[in-house]
């Protein structure tokens, strides 16, 4: 028995698929395709395949029969043809190269009526696409069914038709008017892309036409393609600086079109090299030329503007001093910055260092300027330039104080640093003192005039006398005066006594004239035909005022008398009430006393009658 177990167990020589197991144990040639392929981390599933890769033809084989509206053979052939056409496409899905929209298109096209409901599209997917065969249940089909609904409502190639029957889902059909090729998303169709493209095309055509016509910017600058037409036309025909071509720019200034920071074709104030801080003196450009006519025109223009602004500023200062308004506190003392102090020290050490040859109007610009100098090209030092030699250089320092606006003329001393001989310095000092004296005299005269005007305005109106006023033959028409007063409104009370108008109507016109008697007054004045002079009118007004005062006094006296009478009556009433109360009290007391006396008397015993026994 045991010997039988010592024998070797029988081995199977074939497997289920017909291959011998001995063959599997031999040396098999390893396929190179099974080795791990290296790829970048940016590549996601599925891995890109080579271009000459051919997929098997039996990828989509239909094993189940469709319903009566589906044709399995036609749909399978159409899907295979579509897959063969898209073998080298970059789009890779788990079921192949076809997208959801392509699958829905094949499903609807395979139906006999060329229309399917949503449930029939789901059924076609499960029956004809191997990837969805095991995903037909409700748990695993939620994702791809949602994608199908999304694609149906998104693409224009699908159209929804209402079903005739009640309670049935709608039909989905292919839109015959849809454009072939890649479908356009509906969200993009709402944008006005056509109009936008037309406008861009017109702008490009204009730019090209202007370039071909030879329109270039300043210094032969070509505008960039992204710049608009207006940016390439930086010409100033109205400006006197650019007309005639006499004004040339410095080569140190470059255009923004040649820089990396901007694509504009305008000039940039940034110098190309040797950048200096703002407080440094700018370089004297020798090639900056200007014609003599332009220079004279600029001098006249800036001179007249400076004179007008100076006069306005002086008038404002005079009025503020005359009106007695609180003036602003004086500005703090000027303290030059550190770099300015260093420059002044260098200038003091070498005062003649900048005495080089200068041409034209080459002067150093002010370091800190007022608001007028910043906004306008003001020539405040033109008068000083006329008295200077060509080699002299003048610098004006006007510090900017906080919380205060510096005036255009500054009305105070200029600190002139003259880097020339002592003779020019003395001449400038004398001229400066003369200007200060003239300004002080002008401001004093303006201040006196303003004070005089304010004093005249402060006088009361009662002191104004018409007799001292030279009126001449000035006459007043009462009718026109009344009509004018009535035109302002019917709430005016005009009091004019009629005694001076007509002596026969003294009794009827003794009282003041109210607004109801204006028509009678106009008739009387028109019938009389006499005109009142200003003196008579003044006398009438005085009489009216006196009458009004008398009436007011009478009314006040009457009110006072009535008040006194009322108080006396109240006192009398109080006295009467007190006396009546006393009488009533005494009467009640006497009656009570009599009653008590009667009750206190002893009773009298009377004898019985005679008939009583």
UniProtKB/Swiss-Prot annotation:
DNA-binding feature ranges: 95-201
Keywords: Activator, Cell cycle, Cytoplasm, Developmental protein, Differentiation, DNA-binding, Growth regulation, Nucleus, Phosphoprotein, Transcription, Transcription regulation
Positions where Phosphoserine occurs in the chain: 75, 190, 259, 262-263, 268
Keyword Transit peptide: no
InterPro entries, alphabetized: Fork_head_dom, TF_fork_head_CS_2, WH-like_DNA-bd_sf, WH_DNA-bd_sf
Biased composition annotated in UniProt, kind: Low complexity: 81-90, 337-353
Compositional bias segments (type: Pro residues): 327-336
Regions of compositional bias (Polar residues) in chain numbering: 63-80, 221-230, 256-265
Any GO CC annotation of this UniProt entry: nucleus
Disruption outcome: Mutant foxo lacking Akt1 phosphorylation sites no longer responds to insulin inhibition, remains in the nucleus, and is constitutively active, inducing cell arrest.
Major localization listed first in the record, in broad terms: cytoplasm
A Pfam entry, by short name: Forkhead
Phosphothreonine found at: 44
Superkingdom of source: Eukaryota
Outcome (variant: residue 259 to A): Abolishes phosphorylation
Function (record text): Transcription factor involved in the regulation of the insulin signaling pathway. Consistently activates both the downstream target Thor\d4EBP and the feedback control target InR. Involved in negative regulation of the cell cycle, modulating cell growth and proliferation. In response to cellular stresses, such as nutrient deprivation or increased levels of reactive oxygen species, foxo is activated and inhibits growth through the action of target genes such as Thor.
Quaternary structure and interacting proteins, as annotated: Interacts with melt.
The protein's name in its UniProt record: Forkhead box protein O
Organism name: Drosophila melanogaster (Fruit fly)
């Amino acid at each position: 028995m045991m010997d039988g177990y010592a024998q070797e167990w029988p081995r199977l020589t074939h497997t289920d698929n017909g291959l011998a197991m001995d063959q599997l144990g031999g040396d098999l040639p390893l396929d190179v395709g099974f080795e791990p392929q290296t790829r970048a981390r940016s590549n996601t599933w599925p891995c890109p395949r080579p271009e000459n890769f051919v997929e098997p033809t039996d990828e989509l084989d239909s094993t189940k029969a469709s319903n009566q509206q589906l044709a399995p053979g036609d749909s399978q052939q159409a899907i295979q043809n579509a897959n063969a056409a898209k073998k080298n496409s970059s789009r890779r899905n788990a079921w192949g190269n076809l997208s959801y929209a392509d699958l829905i298109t094949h499903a609807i096209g395979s139906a006999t009526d060329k229309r399917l409901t949503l449930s029939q599209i789901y059924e076609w997917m499960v029956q004809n696409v191997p990837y969805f065969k095991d995903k037909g249940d409700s748990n695993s089909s939620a994702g791809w069914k949602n994608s199908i609904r999304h694609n149906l409502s998104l693409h224009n190639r699908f159209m929804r038709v209402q079903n005739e029957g009640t309670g049935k889902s709608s039909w989905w059909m292919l839109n015959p008017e849809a454009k072939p090729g890649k479908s356009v998303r509906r969200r993009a169709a709402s944008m006005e892309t056509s109009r936008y493209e037309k406008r861009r095309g017109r702008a490009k055509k204009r730019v090209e036409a202007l370039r071909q016509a030879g329109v270039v910017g300043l210094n032969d600058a070509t505008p960039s393609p992204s710049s608009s037409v207006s940016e390439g036309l930086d010409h100033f025909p109205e400006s006197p600086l650019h007309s005639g071509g006499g004004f040339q720019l410095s080569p140190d200034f470059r255009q923004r079109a040649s820089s990396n920071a901007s694509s504009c074709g305008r000039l940039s104030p940034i110098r190309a090299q040797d950048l200096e801080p703002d407080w440094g003196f700018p370089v004297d450009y020798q090639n900056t030329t200007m014609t003599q006519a332009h220079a004279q025109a600029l001098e006249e223009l800036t001179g007249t503007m400076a004179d007008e602004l100076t006069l306005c500023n002086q008038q404002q200062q005079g009025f503020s001093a005359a009106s007695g308004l609180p003036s602003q506190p004086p500005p703090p003392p000027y303290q030059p910055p550190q770099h300015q102090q260093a420059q002044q020290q260098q200038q003091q050490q070498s005062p003649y260092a900048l005495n080089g040859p200068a041409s034209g109007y080459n002067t150093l610009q002010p370091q800190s300027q007022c608001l007028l100098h910043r906004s306008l090209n003001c020539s405040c030092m033109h008068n000083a330039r006329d008295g200077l030699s060509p080699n002299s250089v003048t610098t004006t320092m006007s510090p900017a104080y906080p919380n205060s606006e510096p005036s255009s003329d500054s009305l105070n001393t200029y600190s002139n640093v003259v880097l020339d001989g002592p003779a020019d310095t003395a001449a400038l000092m004398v001229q400066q003192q003369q200007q200060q004296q003239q300004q002080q005299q002008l401001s004093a005269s303006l201040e006196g005039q303003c004070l005089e005007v304010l004093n005249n305005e402060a006088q009361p109106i009662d002191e104004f006398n018409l007799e001292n006023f030279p009126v001449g033959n000035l006459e007043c028409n009462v009718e026109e005066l009344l009509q004018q007063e009535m035109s302002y409104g019917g709430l005016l009370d005009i009091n004019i006594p009629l005694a001076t108008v007509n002596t026969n109507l003294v009794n009827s016109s003794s009282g003041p004239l109210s607004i109801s008697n204006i028509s009678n007054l106009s008739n009387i004045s028109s019938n009389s035909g006499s005109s009142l002079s200003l003196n008579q009118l003044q006398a009438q007004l005085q009489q009216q005022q006196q009458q009004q005062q008398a009436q007011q006094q009478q009314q006040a006296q009457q009110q006072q008398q009535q008040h006194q009478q009322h108080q006396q009556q109240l006192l009398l009433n109080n006295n009467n009430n007190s006396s009546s109360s006393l009488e009533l009290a005494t009467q009640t007391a006497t009656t009570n006393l009599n009653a008590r006396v009667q009750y206190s008397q002893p009773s009298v015993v009377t004898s019985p009658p005679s008939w009583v026994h």
